[in-house]
């Protein structure tokens, strides 16, 4: 009998790294709203009350970078006064010319992965599914309870037996809070208002462990407790470590950057494989060279759960999907200002996004 525990974590929108992701994607949306053909790679770093916005852009849009950053921080729930410094240059003409020659070509080389499984109705692994769900619920509760503050993290450990979900072993929730709130009250709020409404009670038992603010007091948070930078939560953004990732972050990048668009397409392919019951688990990898519109390789792994051999499933993928970069942008409609919505609680598993649709496969 093969028994093991797998753990994934998520963070709230007030986590400093996620603050930076949201600022970067809010800037991207502002550019795409005015100029859908914007090429953007504008990132953010934050520490204390200092915000640095930096990167490259090629756009006809008129963007007030500082105003977007300050509005994003305020919307998250931080009320301190912040100072913004902007260092944004024109995108290299060599890169711009390589990407924009007729049909859109890959904006960089790299490898991308997509993953799906049948552990949840969203075709996401259960540990990250519940970690995100807890983080979203924590934010919802916080917005209606002044005792809680924006920064927070969640973590869920799931026990598997022969690769089947058995139970939830451990739940960890850490939340920033007001100074005059006791840890006993925090634990009561989190257990009753965050954990119980989120978690299927059939997965919990008398041995499930709960760690709520295990370090104790958590008054100082956000950028005053830790620095933040765009692109530092790529495991939270994807599959919680359950599926592999290519290493490139998503936030800040326009869809010509295949780090983002091709990873979305790989998820679309993997999810369609599982939803069409060709496999219980599927992982798709693709690679590109800068300035080329077609991938240089792609493969699939169904981890022994496939209805057919992986070679046959790869053939089905080739007959049903087109990994041409220009096609990816068109098929998934990626030139729209949709990216701020992706920047918290994972880029995958939310049915509002085009890459979460399911394609009926012909085979």
PLM regions and their residue ranges:
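Short, charge-patterned binding micro-sites
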Residues: 42-59, 290-294
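Glycine-rich, mobile lid/loop segments that gate access to catalytic sites or pores
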Residues: 7-11, 50, 67, 74, ...
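Short connector loops/turns at beta-strand edges and beta->alpha or beta->beta junctions
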Residues: 2, 47, 118, 239-245
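Alpha-helical support elements that line or immediately flank enzyme active sites
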Residues: 13-32, 120-136, 254-277
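Glycine-rich anion/phosphate-binding loop at the beta-strand->alpha-helix junction
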Residues: 181-273
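A short glycine-rich, hydrophobically flanked beta-strand micro-motif that places a catalytic Asp/Glu
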Residues: 38-42, 148-158, 208-212, 278-289
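Internal helix-turn-beta structural module
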Residues: 47, 279-281, 285-363
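N-terminal, positively charged regions that mediate nucleic acid binding
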Residues: 1-41, 46-47, 141
């Amino acid at each position: 009998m093969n028994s093991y525990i797998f753990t994934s974590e998520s963070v709230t929108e007030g986590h400093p790294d996620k603050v930076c992701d949201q600022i970067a994607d809010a800037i991207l949306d502002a550019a795409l709203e005015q100029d859908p053909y914007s090429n953007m790679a504008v990132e953010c770093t934050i520490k204390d009350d200092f915000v640095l916005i930096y990167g490259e852009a090629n756009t006809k849009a008129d963007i007030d970078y500082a105003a977007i950053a300050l509005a994003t921080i305020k919307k998250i729930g931080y009320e301190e006064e912040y100072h913004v410094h902007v260092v944004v240059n024109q995108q290299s003409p060599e890169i711009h010319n390589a990407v924009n020659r007729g049909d859109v070509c890959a904006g960089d080389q790299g490898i991308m992965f997509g993953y799906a499984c049948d552990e949840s109705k969203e075709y996401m692994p259960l540990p990250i599914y519940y970690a995100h769900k807890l983080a979203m619920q924590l934010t919802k509760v916080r917005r209606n309870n002044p005792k809680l503050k924006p920064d927070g993290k969640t973590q869920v450990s799931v026990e598997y037996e022969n690769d089947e979900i058995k139970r939830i072993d451990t739940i960890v929730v850490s939340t920033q809070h007001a100074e005059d709130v006791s840890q006993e009250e925090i634990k009561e709020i989190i257990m009753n208002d965050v954990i119980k409404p989120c978690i299927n009670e059939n997965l919990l038992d008398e041995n499930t462990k709960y760690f709520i603010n295990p370090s104790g007091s958590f008054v100082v948070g956000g950028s005053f407790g830790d620095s933040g930078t765009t692109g530092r939560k790529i495991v939270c953004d994807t599959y919680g470590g359950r599926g592999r990732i290519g290493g490139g972050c998503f936030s800040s990048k326009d869809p010509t950057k295949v780090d983002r668009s091709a990873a979305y397409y790989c998820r679309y392919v993997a999810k369609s494989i599982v939803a069409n019951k060709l496999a219980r688990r599927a992982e798709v990898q693709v690679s590109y060279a800068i300035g080329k519109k077609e991938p240089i390789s792609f493969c699939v792994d169904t981890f022994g759960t496939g209805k057919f051999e992986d070679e046959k499933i790869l053939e089905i993928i080739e007959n049903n999907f087109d990994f041409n970069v220009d096609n990816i942008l068109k098929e998934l409609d990626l030139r729209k200002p949709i990216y701020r919505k992706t920047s918290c609680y994972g880029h995958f598993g939310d049915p509002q996004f085009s890459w979460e649709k399911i394609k009926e496969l012909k085979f």
